[in-house]
Amino acid sequence: CEFTAKHGDLDLRFTPAPTAQEGMTGHAMAAARRGAGYRSEVALSGQYQNLRVRGRCDGFDPASRRLDEVKTFKGSLERQPAVQRHLHWAQAKVYGWLLCQQEGWNALDVALVYLDIGSQQETVLVEHCSAQQLQEHFEQHCGRFLLWAGQQLAHRMARDTALQALTFPFGDFRAGQRPLAEAVY
């Protein structure tokens, strides 16, 4: 999603950012605050055409049918660029479709849980989504990725074919090149 959902500003920094260790601690803290039936770090996978998509959602509550995508931050959440929030929703909704598919659900709540590392306060943003909406979102992003991947493959094949047709400009080493090449190799 981070690739196919990018738009707008290329500067995705949201500073100051938590360290990796703070992020892991924050995720554990958020999971510990949930109810007894809450499942955390759930592996999900799905297929779109010949593309296999795998990921791990931060957690979900089967009783309330809510998927949580936890994001840790420092400072003011209001300073977070809209572009970054868009990426977070894209990721969470892909996980939402994979979870609906896995559990056989026709809808669920998708939540972005922003945890301020400093204050340990959560800001929770929730969207109710039908499985159909999530599937359309998933297929749109997978389709974009496959289009890009196909273009990359075509470019590489054309490049490699052109490189095979090239001839080196000189038939033999020039004076001093062979000993230099041997010394380097």
For each predicted feature, which ranges?
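Metal-dependent nuclease catalytic cores in nucleic-acid-processing enzymes
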Residues: 28-34, 83-112
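Metal-dependent nuclease catalytic cores that hydrolyze phosphodiester bonds in DNA/RNA
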Residues: 1-65, 90
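Alpha-helix N-cap/helix-initiation motif
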Residues: 80-85, 173
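A broad, structural surface signal
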Residues: 28, 93, 97, 143, ...
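Metal-dependent nuclease catalytic regions and adjoining charged, substrate-binding loops involved
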Residues: 97-165
